[in-house]
């Protein structure tokens, strides 16, 4: 008790006493209920027990805490509610209006319904136990008699006498919740008439009054009444009998409507079983007819004025009005306000006096409570519930004051009529609301712009206060054209919002007009973002915070677009300024009020400012004061308010945490970061894409999270640029980026959308492509998510190509992605085909499609750290197979599908891609299950090699001796500080986990190439170093995906090649935007396979066996390995064959991927003791088929023994069901390879080949544009042809180091040979030091000496194997003829590689 200061006694009874008190620490006013005698139930006082159980109910008084005093009295601390229902209806039998009665009774029934649904009876419902706060929330109090339904020990002396039902008066001890309903009926009559329904002095008189009104009950109308203990005394033979009669015959009920009488009679039915329940009462027609339930504005004035109010003499003199009609003093505080209606002027004067008195009282209360709230904010001992209640009271009072002031103005202008509503200006206010709504709808954009500027500036300015060194920049930006651009953007957004609301159904039906408008209008937002980013361009780290503000504001605007159709007024306040003002679309009359409140009351408290604005907007929109349908909303009104408050708090807390985390991440992971000196254009382009994607997604709320994340990562892309020094010096001042995207909890694809955003014209081209893709995506709502995400990747393609444009060996990018893409799968889970496309961008395609496709299952279940360049190999094969099917389908279905394309893509600029894509749509309907899985896997594979492979020329150096620490994801250190790397390397790191979160997602930052681990289950991703040289795969991959986006039927990768063919041939005029991407697609088909083979050779996986996943899904696919050629030749026969081809090709590719797992030893995270440079041991492995294959590292000798067998190609039984079988072999492989005496020479040769391969890739990018059509056609004819092309390209890479023309020739040779060299795609090349004759001799010798322990295949398969072998020999002959010497920068030379079967 020492914690409280008792102010006054406010109630007493047999239960104890209730005091008004102040909590000493928080200065919060509370009610203390002290009970000396208490009923104990299950060890707790009854009242405490049930109040604790019901403390979350909105219509139940809130118990803050309870304790026992020194004298063992129970002290319960309640929220303080000054009023109760009795005070509204008690003064001289003053009755309430019907609408006000409905307003409170509805809340009372809601509270009782909550009690009864939890099997609780209150047993003391009466007006004095129904507390009311200034917001007019009714709360049930006094649970001293409460018990549970079915209690066998019930007492009949419960409930106050005037509200006690007849069964209790007659001594019943077997009753239920019907007794509470009887009390509610009595309260209704009391509220409407101002008199008690039954006011007997004892039980017998009370019963007599009841029977006089409703008649004496009998067994007929009350079965079981004769069994009650009080039946004989009250209803015996000597008792008086009363006839039943209608309430209409009673004078005080004559004015009641039929529905009012009906609900009263159903509540006051004598037989308890016939009484209405709370749920039935809440649905009674009485609540749904005029007058509508509304809060008691007039009655609250009466109640407030009737209380003593201290008014100064000066105020009294001011309010003494002398005029022609006489003088009128102020109404005494204790009198009842019933204005005399002798004249309108008299009524006006009296009402004005009341308003003046009421204003003084309300202002005083508001100021007192505001002081209390300010003190409460600094304390933590009082629950948040009290904070919210106090502040809500303040704001509602202030709103009420504003209304009274308006009424005062109306009174002074004599705008009153004789009726009560006009007396207080309610009707006039209704008209004003309607007019304001109309006017504001017309002028919505202007108000919205002004409000947005204020709120955005205030919000961002608050953030800048935390970063003081950015205040000036921010102010300068606001004073410049930024505001103008932002205003224009808001205008456009508002217009588009209206369009979206009006045409939402049309948008769902492939109407792109509104979406296009959104995109175009949002370009203004982009201009704002551009200026904003430019203003902060030279600041370090702070870009993260300010850009976060921009991204949140942009997304919030779009959130309102999605929510406007349902509940603009309320949801608009979920997210600060922009959303706040978006609500003006519906409730615009409150827009001005919102501004005035924000300028005064809410400036220091955005939580409650937003909340109270939402509350007041709800009041207006629901016509709470204007006779609207508030009773329908009242049931959920307070719940929505509470949810709204929590949502605002959670959003703000989450936003602050995200901002703080981003700053911490940036500082922790980027120790080399310095202020960015470039990338302004890139920043703006990225923001453009974000806004565009989001607005196009207005029809699909699932994309909100994606684009939120995208916006966040745009900031990461903006400011995470650094210029390293010393060992990382960039002599040409090329762009260096560290893209650390740790915020991608929702969408990994959007993160990829920000890779290498380096600015320049290519970025702008990327934006144009994105715009078109976004518009195309709107054609199909089911694919909006996929397309929008892929549109971001389209931007990536161009950014990546820009990154590679200045390829002087000085560019370097570390891409660390700590991505948890669970949300991708969840958001797009219904789009089976689209999932792969979205997640495929970053390798998560495997995860999503692992349940659908064997090949994808293989990749998705990999928990090893194998480099995924082999995945590229497989997926490129899939591309070719699918393209083959699609090209033929295009030829057959071209005319019909062109019509479909026109219907689906009315607003697309990139119709080049869409023509052929749409052609495939009609056929893909039957092949979606197979083709799309293959395609999705294809996206994943390409992305495996998709990284900013920026070459870095530097002498070999030791990481531990680097001039600066290298930032690692999650602060991971290099496994071995003595690792040394090759002279020329490219590195990036992707770790994409779909399920079970992040495992070890921070794979090697410095692999010799891109390491991409795609994990479906949480395996351990070790550091794997793979030597990689495919520099342009990023562009190729993404362009493939980009083309896929334009096709909403998800035959994505199948359409790539067909798109290239048709675009190059038929749409040359439009190929300005897409020609490069199409060429890159072709290069992707060739170069990725080259890289796959090359990386298969150069990648050794020591920790492959870390995964526990088996790959049973490949069992079926191996049976088709030898039948690929036949199936491919039958692609035109029917769609089912196409499906088989796709499946066969996937499995075939999977086998190829298995082969590519065997590569030279590169250090993994398990090797921590090697101090020597990386040694690379060549391995030769031919094509094979594995079932239940778990990738394992092999020694070179073991692999040579396997490859020497002539039956190795046809074997189908090489099965490793348990990865642990090869753990000894794994160790031996590590030892054999690391101890190889020729490591240095191989390293040098590999360096040379790496450069040659890189140069050839550059050449391919430029030169293959001329050969795209031919290459695609050849690739489409045979899946394996493309792989053979890749091998041939590898053979010619070294020769192309000096001559680019040879590259073109090799491409043409590849095209000629692609139809024949089907098996070459499954062969792996090997670098050797011996001459060619010795190699061939050794090969034949090994075939004669060594034999495989594996069982042979069938005769048909052997024949196919022989044919393939012959074709491979022909290919070798051509390739060997092109062998030549190439010298690298170090003067070393090596023979051109040959391919061994």
Curated annotation (Swiss-Prot):
MF GO annotations: ATP binding; cyclin-dependent protein serine/threonine kinase activity; protein serine kinase activity
Ribonucleoprotein keyword on record: no
Keyword Transferase assigned: yes
Gene3D superfamilies according to UniProt: Phosphorylase Kinase, domain 1, Transferase(Phosphotransferase) domain 1
EC number assigned by the record: 2.7.11.22
Gene Ontology biological-process entries: regulation of cell cycle phase transition
Keywords, sorted A to Z: ATP-binding, Kinase, Nucleotide-binding, Serine/threonine-protein kinase, Transferase
Coiled coil: none
EC main group: transferase
GO CC terms in record: cytoplasm; nucleus
Region (Disordered): 412-567, 671-728, 763-831, 845-949, 996-1101, 1115-1174, 1227-1324, 1340-1397
Compositional bias annotation for Low complexity: 676-715, 845-941, 1012-1021, 1028-1101, 1115-1155, 1253-1321, 1354-1380
UniProt-listed Pfam families: Pkinase
Residues forming the catalytic site: 124 (proton acceptor)
Reactions listed under catalytic activity: L-seryl-[protein] + ATP = O-phospho-L-seryl-[protein] + ADP + H(+); L-threonyl-[protein] + ATP = O-phospho-L-threonyl-[protein] + ADP + H(+)
Membrane spanning residue stretches: none
Organism domain of life: Eukaryota
Binding site for ATP: 10-18, 33
PANTHER family given in the database record: CELL DIVISION PROTEIN KINASE (PTHR24056), ECDYSONE-INDUCED PROTEIN 63E, ISOFORM N (PTHR24056:SF246)
Family to which this protein belongs: Belongs to the protein kinase superfamily. CMGC Ser/Thr protein kinase family. CDC2/CDKX subfamily.
The protein's name: Probable cyclin-dependent serine/threonine-protein kinase DDB_G0292550
């Amino acid at each position: 008790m020492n914690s409280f200061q008792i102010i006054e006694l406010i109630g007493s009874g047999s239960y104890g006493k209730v005091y008004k008190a102040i909590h000493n620490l928080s200065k919060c006013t509370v009610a203390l209920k002290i009970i000396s005698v208490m009923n104990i139930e299950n060890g707790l006082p009854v009242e405490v027990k049930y109040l604790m159980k019901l403390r979350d109910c909105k219509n139940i008084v809130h118990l803050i805490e309870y304790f026992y005093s020194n004298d063992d009295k129970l002290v319960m601390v309640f929220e303080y509610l000054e009023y109760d229902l009795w005070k509204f209806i008690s003064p001289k039998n003053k009755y309430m209006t019907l609408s006000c009665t409905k307003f409170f009774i509805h809340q009372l029934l809601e509270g009782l319904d909550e009690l009864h649904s939890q099997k609780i009876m209150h047993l003391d419902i009466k007006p004095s136990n129904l507390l009311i706060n200034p917001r007019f929330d009714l709360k049930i109090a006094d649970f001293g008699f409460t018990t549970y339904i079915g209690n066998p020990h019930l007492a009949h002396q419960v409930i106050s006498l005037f509200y006690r039902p007849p069964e209790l008066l007659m001594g019943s001890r077997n009753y239920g919740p019907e007794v509470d309903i009887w009390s509610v009926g009595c309260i209704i009559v009391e509220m409407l008439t101002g008199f008690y329904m039954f006011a007997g002095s004892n039980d017998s008189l009370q019963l007599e009054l009841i029977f006089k009104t409703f008649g004496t009950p009998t067994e007929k109308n009350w079965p079981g009444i004769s069994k009650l203990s009080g039946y004989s005394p009250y209803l015996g033979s000597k008792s008086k009998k009363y006839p039943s009669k209608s309430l209409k015959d009673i004078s005080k009920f004559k004015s009641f409507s039929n529905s009012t009488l009906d609900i009263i009679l159903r509540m006051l039915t004598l037989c308890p079983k016939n009484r209405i329940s709370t749920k039935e009462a809440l649905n009674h027609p009485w609540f749904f007819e005029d007058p509508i339930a509304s809060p008691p504005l007039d009655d609250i004035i009466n109640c407030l004025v009737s209380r003593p109010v201290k008014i100064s003499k000066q105020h009294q003199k001011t309010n003494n009005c002398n005029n022609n009609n006489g003088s009128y003093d102020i109404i005494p505080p204790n009198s009842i306000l019933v204005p005399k209606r002798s004249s309108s002027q008299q009524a006006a004067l009296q009402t004005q006096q009341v308003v003046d008195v009421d204003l003084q009282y309300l202002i005083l209360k508001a100021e007192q409570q505001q002081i209390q709230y300010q003190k409460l904010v600094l304390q933590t001992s009082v629950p948040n519930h009290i904070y919210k209640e106090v502040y809500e009271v303040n704001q509602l009072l202030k709103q009420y004051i504003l209304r009274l002031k308006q009424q005062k103005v109306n009174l002074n202008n004599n705008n009153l009529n004789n009726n009560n509503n006009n007396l207080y200006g309610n009707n006039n206010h209704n008209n004003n609301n309607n007019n304001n709504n109309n006017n504001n709808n017309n002028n919505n954009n202007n108000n919205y712009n002004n409000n947005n500027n204020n709120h955005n500036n205030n919000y961002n300015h608050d953030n800048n206060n935390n970063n003081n060194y950015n205040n000036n920049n921010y102010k300068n930006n606001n004073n410049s054209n930024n505001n103008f651009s932002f205003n224009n953007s808001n205008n456009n957004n508002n217009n588009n919002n209206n369009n979206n609301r009006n045409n939402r159904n049309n948008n769902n039906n492939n109407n792109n007009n509104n979406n296009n408008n959104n995109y175009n209008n949002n370009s203004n937002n982009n201009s704002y973002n551009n200026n904003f980013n430019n203003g902060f361009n030279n600041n370090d780290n702070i870009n993260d915070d300010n850009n976060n503000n921009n991204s949140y504001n942009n997304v919030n605007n779009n959130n309102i677009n999605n929510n406007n159709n349902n509940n603009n007024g309320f949801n608009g306040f979920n997210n600060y300024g922009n959303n706040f003002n978006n609500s003006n679309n519906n409730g615009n009359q409150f827009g001005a009020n919102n501004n005035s409140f924000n300028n005064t009351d809410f400036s220091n408290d955005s939580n409650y400012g937003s909340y109270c604005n939402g509350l007041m907007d709800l009041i207006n929109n629901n016509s709470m004061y204007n006779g609207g349908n508030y009773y329908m909303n009242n049931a959920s009104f307070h719940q929505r308010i509470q949810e709204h408050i929590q949502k605002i708090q959670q959003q703000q807390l989450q936003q602050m945490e995200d901002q703080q985390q981003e700053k911490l991440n940036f500082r922790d992971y980027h120790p080399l970061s310095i202020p960015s000196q470039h990338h302004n254009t890139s920043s703006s382009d990225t923001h453009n894409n974000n806004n565009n994607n989001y607005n196009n997604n207005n029809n699909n709320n699932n994309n909100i999270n994606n684009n939120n994340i995208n916006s966040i990562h745009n900031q990461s892309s903006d400011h995470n640029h650094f210029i390293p020094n010393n060992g990382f010096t960039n002599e040409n001042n090329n762009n260096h980026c560290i893209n650390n995207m740790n915020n991608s909890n929702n969408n990994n694809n959007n993160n990829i959308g920000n890779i290498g955003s380096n600015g320049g014209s290519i970025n702008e081209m990327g934006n144009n492509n994105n715009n078109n893709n976004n518009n195309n995506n709107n054609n199909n709502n089911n694919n909006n998510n996929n397309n929008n995400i892929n549109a971001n990747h389209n931007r990536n393609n161009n950014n990546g190509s820009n990154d590679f444009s200045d390829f002087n060996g000085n560019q370097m990018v570390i891409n660390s992605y700590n991505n948890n893409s669970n949300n991708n799968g969840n958001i797009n889970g219904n789009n089976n085909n689209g999932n792969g496309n979205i997640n495929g961008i970053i390798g998560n395609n495997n995860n999503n499609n692992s349940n659908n496709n064997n090949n994808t299952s293989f990749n998705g279940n990999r928990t090893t750290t194998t480099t995924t360049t082999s995945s590229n190999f497989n997926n490129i094969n899939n591309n070719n197979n699918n393209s083959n099917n699609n090209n033929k389908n295009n030829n057959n279905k071209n005319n019909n599908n062109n019509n479909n394309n026109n219907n689906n893509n009315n607003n697309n600029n990139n119709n080049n891609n869409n023509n052929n894509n749409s052609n495939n749509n009609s056929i893909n309907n039957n092949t979606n299950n197979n083709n799309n899985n293959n395609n999705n896997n294809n996206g994943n594979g390409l992305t495996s090699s998709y990284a900013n492979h920026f070459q870095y020329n530097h002498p070999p150096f030791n990481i531990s001796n680097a001039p600066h620490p290298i930032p690692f994801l999650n602060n991971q250190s290099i496994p071995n500080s003595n690792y040394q790397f090759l002279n020329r390397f490219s590195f990036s790191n992707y770790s994409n986990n779909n399920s079970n979160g992040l495992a070890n997602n921070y794979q090697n930052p410095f692999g010799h190439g891109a390491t991409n681990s795609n994990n479906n289950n949480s395996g351990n991703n070790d550091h794997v170093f793979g030597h990689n040289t495919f520099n342009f795969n990023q562009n190729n991959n993404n362009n493939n995906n980009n083309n896929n986006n334009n096709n909403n039927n998800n035959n994505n990768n199948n359409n790539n090649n067909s798109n290239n063919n048709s675009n190059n041939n038929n749409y040359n005029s439009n190929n300005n935007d897409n020609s490069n991407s199409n060429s890159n697609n072709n290069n992707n088909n060739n170069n990725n396979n080259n890289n796959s083979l090359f990386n298969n050779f150069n990648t050794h996986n020591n920790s492959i066996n870390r995964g526990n996943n088996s790959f049973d899904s490949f069992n079926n696919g191996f049976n088709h390995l030898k039948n690929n050629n036949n199936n491919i030749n039958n692609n035109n026969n029917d769609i089912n064959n196409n499906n088989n081809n796709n499946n066969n090709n996937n499995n075939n590719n999977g086998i190829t991927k298995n082969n590519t797992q065997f590569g030279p030893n590169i250090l993994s995270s398990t090797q921590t003791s090697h101090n020597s440079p990386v040694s690379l041991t060549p391995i030769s492995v031919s094509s094979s088929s594995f079932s239940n294959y778990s990738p394992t590292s092999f020694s070179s000798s073991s692999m040579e023994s396997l490859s020497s067998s002539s039956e190795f190609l046809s074997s189908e039984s090489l099965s490793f069901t348990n990865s642990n079988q090869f753990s000894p072999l794994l160790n031996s492989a590590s030892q054999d390879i690391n101890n190889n005496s020729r490591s240095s020479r191989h390293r040098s040769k590999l360096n040379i080949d790496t450069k040659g391969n890189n140069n050839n890739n550059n050449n391919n990018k430029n030169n293959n544009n001329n050969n795209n059509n031919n290459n695609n056609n050849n690739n489409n004819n045979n899946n394996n042809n493309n792989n053979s092309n890749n091998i041939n390209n590898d053979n010619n890479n070294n020769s192309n180091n000096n001559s680019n023309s040879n590259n073109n020739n090799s491409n043409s040779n590849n095209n000629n040979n692609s139809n024949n060299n089907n098996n070459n795609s499954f062969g792996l090349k090997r670098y050797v030091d011996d001459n060619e004759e010795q190699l061939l001799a050794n090969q034949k010798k090994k075939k004669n000496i060594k034999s495989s322990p594996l069982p042979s295949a069938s005769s048909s398969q052997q024949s196919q194997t022989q044919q393939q072998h012959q074709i491979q020999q022909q290919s070798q002959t051509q390739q060997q003829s092109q062998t030549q010497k190439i010298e690298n920068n170090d003067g070393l030379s090596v023979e051109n590689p040959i391919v061994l079967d």
